[in-house]
Amino acid sequence: RSRRQRQMCIRDSPQTGLLYLFIKHTSAALSINENADPDVRTDMESIFNHLIKEREPYYEHTLEGWDDMPAHAKATIIGVSLTIPITEGRLNMGIWQGIYLCEFRNHGGGRKIVATVMGE
């Protein structure tokens, strides 16, 4: 977990509840995956690039660049939101789990994430 994630849990979170994260974009996604080995990120990118290729002749949505339609498809598969339990004031995640912002454009812009904390 990042230092910011830990600080957020210590300072702002309820003892029990949920953290809901929502990314406000259609060519990026949020995911939870292993964060101990950076090869996981590399492998995940390779897998998605193999499954959903750029520059396919059947894409009709091409005005925003050849990487845009594949980015939409990848984001649809992964999803735009996460819900993480909060237990004893901390994110209740596995020891190897981390939150990923999955950028699927080759040159993605700034991304905005809405974080909603619910609980008591």
What do the predicted segments below correspond to?
Residues 29-41:
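Glycine-rich loop at the start of a catalytic domain that most often binds anionic cofactors/ligands
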Residues 13-16, 49-51:
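Terminal, compositionally biased segments used for targeting/anchoring and flexible tails
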Residues 20-31:
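Short, charge-patterned binding micro-sites
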Residues 94-103, 108-120:
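C-terminal binding/interaction regions
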Residues 1-10:
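Single conserved hydrophobic/aromatic residue that forms the stacking wall/gate
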